[in-house]
């Protein structure tokens, strides 16, 4: 954060999450003796999403759908973040294998060092990443106890939640507060 403050940069935490077409049964109300039920197709058609949350009083949320998680799609996400920020980004990530860039990605990162720097969290420390809270909130608002007939329907619900995060930053403020 000191480095970011010295150059008026923006600290963001990044992560990726998958959302299945199948709904997930989560804590809910039901009549006594009746098991809650969520319809399902039995298919795991997955939406892969990269996301990043800024460490500010009014956190910003950026996201990008990807066909798969790998170094190539991660590079596309980095370019997406840089394109949408006027300030230098300090992106903090976990050690997921998809965050490993190939040679062309490393070269791009070197050429854009004045716009973005990457930092790694210690292994097995998701509690240090507020983006995990954004994913938890997304699943709570979007996929728990819901049945989607199509991937388009699920993706539209996800975009609706992400848009709510962007237009109402207070939804993520609780996940970011301890990092400010």
Where are these predicted regions, by residue range?
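Short functional hotspots at interaction and active-site rims
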Residues: 1-180
């Amino acid at each position: 954060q000191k480095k970011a403050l010295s150059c008026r940069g923006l600290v963001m935490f990044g992560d990726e999450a998958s959302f299945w077409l199948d709904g997930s049964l989560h804590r809910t109300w039901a009549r006594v003796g009746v098991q809650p039920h969520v319809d399902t197709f039995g298919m795991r058609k997955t939406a892969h999403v990269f996301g990043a949350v800024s460490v500010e009083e009014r956190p910003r949320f950026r996201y990008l759908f990807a066909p798969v998680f790998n170094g190539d799609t991660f590079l596309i996400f980095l370019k997406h973040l840089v394109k949408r920020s006027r300030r230098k980004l300090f992106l903090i990530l976990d050690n997921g294998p998809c965050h490993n860039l190939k040679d062309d990605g490393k070269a791009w990162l070197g050429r854009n060092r004045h716009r973005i720097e990457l930092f790694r969290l210690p292994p097995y420390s998701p509690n240090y990443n507020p983006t995990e809270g954004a994913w938890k909130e997304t699943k709570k608002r979007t996929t728990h106890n819901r049945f989607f007939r199509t991937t388009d329907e699920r993706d539209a619900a996800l975009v609706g939640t992400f848009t709510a995060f962007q237009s109402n930053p207070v939804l993520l403020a609780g996940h970011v507060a301890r990092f400010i």
